[in-house]
Amino acid sequence: MAYAKPNQRFRDKQRHVVDLIMRIWVKSSGVGIIAGLMLICFYLLAVIAPIFTSVTVEPLSQYSVSYPHTTLAIGSDEQGKMAYRIDDTGQVQFIDLVSKALVSKKQIIENPTAFTSTIESQDWFAFGDSQGRVQFAQIGFQTNYSKGDRQLIPLVENFSPFPSIQVDKNKQPLTQLALSLTATEGVILATTQDEKLLGVELDSVVNQMTGESVWKAIPIEFEQSGLDKIDALLSMVITPNNDFLYLLYQHELQVWKLKDHKAHLRESIVLKESAQKLTLLSGANSVLVQFDNGSLSQWFDTINNEKRTLTPVRTFNFDAPIVQLSPEVYRKGVSVIDEKGNLSLIHTTTEKKLYSQHLFTDNVLAVTQPPNAEKLIVLTKKGWECFQVTNPHPEVSVQSVFGKIWYEGYPEPAYIWQSTAANDDFESKFSLMPLAFGTLKAAFYALIFAGPIAIGSAIYTAYFMSSNVRRYVKPTIEIMEALPTVIIGLLAGIWLAPIVENNLVAVFSLFVLFPLSMMIIAFIWHILPAHIMRKLPRGQHAILLIPALLGIGYLTFNYGYLIESWLFNGDLRHYLGDKGVGYDQRNALVVGIAMGAAIIPTIYTIAEDAIFSVPKHLSEGSLALGATQWQTLTNVVLLTASPGIFSAVMMGLGRAVGETMIVLMATGNTPLMDGNILEGMRTLAANIAIEMPESEMGSTHFRMLFLAAFLLFVFTFFVNSLAEWIRQGLREKYRSL
């Protein structure tokens, strides 16, 4: 009976312990990788989720009070803690909404006959009287910190250059007003009791000697053809830049152009429904028209046939006619209250009704929102009601992220990414489609360039090249992968892009001449006598091919201008421009070449290993049965290695999709939806790298960048999973070879 020696039993036990430890370590590593991927996914989702949460409106406080006089307007400070009310006697009252007390009041004018205000970002009010005069007032708040406490001090300031302006020389009572007023200019328009439309333009001129501003009031001359029914005028507004005046009648909307103290009628639009009132949307690039049937439509200028026209873009319908409306100060949101007491929060650009609920049983007299849009202040017959509004990301929806949106100033709906701009009234545009398109565009052109070269090189190196030459070629190509992509991107942007621009015909010609010349050289080599072919060792054909390709490249770059003169009138870029094809110096062609050079080592290494690893008995058996080398390659070797070759291409695609520095430095980084190889793009990865440092933590922009990262993560995961599934299928299919 045989017994194991003690030292052998010890070694078996030791081996068992090592196997157990390694098994646990391998399993733990696999589970850890999966857990890490899931944590990344969950973290991205946690940052993204708030942009798709529902809007909430919660009651915050109430202050019961009744006012004997009609309310003309209400407003508040930036945080919605103190409000003001202007009544038809010309008095303004300031109310502390926290302590529910009257803070102060001031008489601005006695019994005004007309009233208006500028957009909320200007905070100017105008009062008309029975003598044809207009008086201005600016209402605001001063913040004072006393002993660590924040105190709001109400302010009412007059327009110092003009205590009042005589708009009507005939001293007729004013019935309607429209106002636009800034620090350097302004326009006041008024209708009179005798049915006239009058206007005064306010201009400030700086005295070069004293540096003081001198204001002038200049009457505006109106074209009389459009002023035949002022008695039926319902509403009028002026844009803050003093360029346009909108007049609303029951079934007509007029657009007037103001220039050089003159006003002429630009266009008149017939309205099918009966209109009520005009309101400027935030930024004053759009005008909102209220209708008697409870609908609200947005209009803005578009250019059609090189002519600017006011166009109805979108319409919102409500359950009852609108009684109060308040646009947000900095966003395209609007608070709407109808006759039934329903509150609706809408975002005009995304065409979303964010919130709709019945909240009011009493008549609503006025509504306003502070600049931060975090509160809603409503004045009813019974007093003040304040609501907390949670609506941090109204501009984001599935449609705005993945669909076409019609933005102000654009002729039609489009996919647009533009997160920031220099002006305050800019509207962020967060469509990810241009970035996703740019990502796929860059990856596509990179694979078009790198795929044939890398796979062809892998086939030749693994199957045809001699082992002595392969020993030097393969490590040389593989070491290219260690080259930093920032260096490749720098060379592409600074060195390669100008070369391509100055030799565009030569570059395109080489894409045809190189493959054609290789086939011609191969054909000539094939028909040469056998004794000549035997002089060159097997697998060293590149010794002849490389000088030939270098010579063709030299001739093409030096004499490509002849082709350009013959076919393209001497300038290919100008010729393409005449055909409507744009050209950017840093374009997809440059990116394709540069990124292709970066992913060639990845594709080559995996594909070459797959081809070289095909069992020798398969190829030798095929050759022994009479097949040629080419037949053996195409019918045996490539089929067996196809799973590895496919994996190589997918790895190259994943590398191209996630590449950042090359795209960042070799393109113009313009988010375009254009497949033109001669124009640039912006990719998801490059966009994250560019904009993440400048985004505010927790802002819509910040979360949209995380959404872009999540899409990149999902796309890469999907491509890799699909590649693995196809690879396994190919492996099972050709296992029997």
Annotate each predicted stretch with a short phrase.
Residues 68-76, 110-123, 162-180, 226-240, ...:
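Repeated scaffold domains used in trafficking and secretory/extracellular systems
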Residues 579-581, 663-713:
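Interhelical loop and adjacent transmembrane-helix boundary motif
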